[in-house]
Amino acid sequence: MSLYGMMRTGVSGMNAQANRLSTVADNIANASTVGYKRAETQFSSLVLPSTAGQYNSGSVLTDVRYGISDQGGIRSTSSTTDLAIDGNGYFVVQGPGGSTYLTRAGSFVPDKNGDLVNSAGYYLLGAGADEAAGGLTVAGLNVVNVNAAALPAEGSTAGDFTVNLPSTDQAPAAGGYNHKTSLISYNDKGEKITLDVYFTKTGADEWNVSVKNAADGVEIGTTVLNFDPTTGDLVSGGNVAVNLGAYGGQTLNLNLGGSTQRAGDYTISQAVINGQAPSSIKGVDVGNDGAVVAVYENGTQKVLYRIPLANVASPNRMTVVSGNIFLPSAESGDVRLGFPQGDGMGKIMSGTLEESNADIAQELTDMIEAQRSYTANSKVFQTGSELMDVLVNLKR
């Protein structure tokens, strides 16, 4: 072993420990960075060929491994567009140049156009609300936009109203009725029209149905229900054409099919009429299955997108890019897409963020180890230098 070889080995060791200290510094600096994945310096020896009686000292090589597949802790936030993944998978995001990447940094907020973008400037990509998992491709994804249009007014055109009329009821006095229920419908401007539905028994198995506008008492629809005397099932008259034309609406077909005349109380098993008033968007929720849902002021919910997750065979072999994003490579394998809670993917948690997976206690321990190792390698170099001085002084 030559003295120069000894000194070169010491320098190699110092460089290796300096690299380790650099990764430790990065980890400590990013201990609070959302979605950050810890870097770790790995060492391997470089052995030089030796001859009999002569040892040639080698050196040490370093490589940096990122714990991309290691999940960090999950903490709660107050924003529904802050997203974390519990389990496998990565969000698919788009950079300013249009390139796509993967990330676990889910601190998304709407920009001025309503597009969801994270703190590093990468836009979240999603699939259509009705997209099937088998048809997912990265090229087919679009930037998720939460500026959903307001719900337009929609006039009522159809409804289902199912009741049980007590078979023991008697026909009321002239001008009276047995039962009354109020229903809400809408004209074409989205204005509410309250409908009063009157049931009046007119025979053993016959009932008159009258639909009136509650505001003025005008009858705008009528029918006669006939029931089977043995089973109590509806035989005829199960549809009422309610004319809302005088109130700015359309003809509402109110279906009474399924109604019965049997023993018991007057009960309603179904009362649904379509139509709606105009409504503005109130907020956006994201489900565990990745559904991005617009919530409107009137309580209506509408699925805007479904957020898919991506994965690769070897996540730790992906290329790390600034902004806590990852670029799949030949070593990591091809990108595979799937929806959360299926296809081997984890679930999306709204109102949470994944923290850095760097542990301060571990990093400080590694820093002390690297510092001591650096000092030891410097002693090797120093000893080699001193021996070289001895060799030079032999000439004197």
Swiss-Prot record:
SUPFAM superfamilies: Flagellar hook protein flgE. Keywords: Bacterial flagellum. GO terms for biological process: bacterial-type flagellum-dependent swarming motility. It comes from the Bacteria. Pfam families: Flg_bb_rod, Flg_bbr_C, FlgE_D2, LlgE_F_G_D1. It is found in: Bacterial flagellum basal body. Its main location: other. Belongs to the flagella basal body rod proteins family. This is Flagellar hook protein FlgE. It comes from Brucella suis biovar 1 (strain 1330). The lineage of its organism: Bacteria, Pseudomonadati, Pseudomonadota, Alphaproteobacteria, Hyphomicrobiales.
